[in-house]
Amino acid sequence: MVDFIVFMKKEGRMIRRLRPVFGFKVIRQKKRTLPEVKQFASIFLFRHGMTFFNRDRKFTGWRDSRLTKQGFDDAKIVALRLKDKKIGVAFHTALTRSKQTLKEVLRFHPETFMVIQDDRLFERAYGKLEGLTHLEFVKKHSPKLYDVYHRSYDTPPPGGESMKMVKERVLSFIKDLLKFVKKHKVNVAISAHGNSMRPFRQYFEKFNNKQMMKLYNAYDAVYEFKVKI
């Protein structure tokens, strides 16, 4: 696994490398007042809103690009979709866009008693491609190589991750998540990233790898998965 990268608020400027936070890191916790769910718990999965890098068609990966105004609007739509649900625990990654989106969602959920960070849900690392626009890469190299690095399952870009690598860490997260949900009998919300959502949906919706690679995750969509307690 390549090391995680944290960037300054200025778009795309790297400041340091960190060890990945693989595993649940509790960010906030308060006394639980929410009753345990019965029979089935819900996992609510959604993508962060549009970022400046998304808007400009840049490879984002682990760069800490923040939400645009449209991105906040996307997050507010997700928040409204989940407004009437009961959410006990919420997950985000270390990336600002994930935190900003979750913050909008949780405005309607005073019942949430725990917020957890887990970077196994990080976006796919695009390595040396990060910060380049898609068009810049195609002009410098070729459309064929673009397709290989952008949508190949098992070929990573230079210094980055393949989707196979992303899938491995996401499946590790899902394994721990299912144990957590069954133990605590609670609904959870997850503010994730486009590429980490693909293997997540593959697991619950039973897609093969080829189908998974074609999945599109809209900025304002919410996916609900039921877990038997």
Model-assigned labels for residue ranges:
Residues 42-47, 91, 186-192:
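Beta-strand elements within well-structured catalytic alpha/beta cores of enzymes
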Residues 44, 50-101, 105-108, 157-171:
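Loop-to-helix element that buttresses phosphate recognition and phosphoryl-transfer chemistry
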Residues 7, 15-18, 22-39, 91:
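Non-catalytic terminal regions with compositionally biased, polar/charged low complexity
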Residues 33, 37-41, 76-146, 204-217, ...:
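Phosphate-coordination/substrate-recognition cap region in phosphate-metabolizing enzymes
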Residues 49, 93-95, 120, 151, ...:
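Short, well-ordered beta-to-alpha junction loops that form the rim of enzyme active sites
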Residues 144-162:
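Extended, charge-rich low-complexity interaction segments
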Residues 33-36, 52, 99, 171-229:
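Active-site-adjacent alpha-helix immediately C-terminal to a catalytic or transition-state-stabilizing loop
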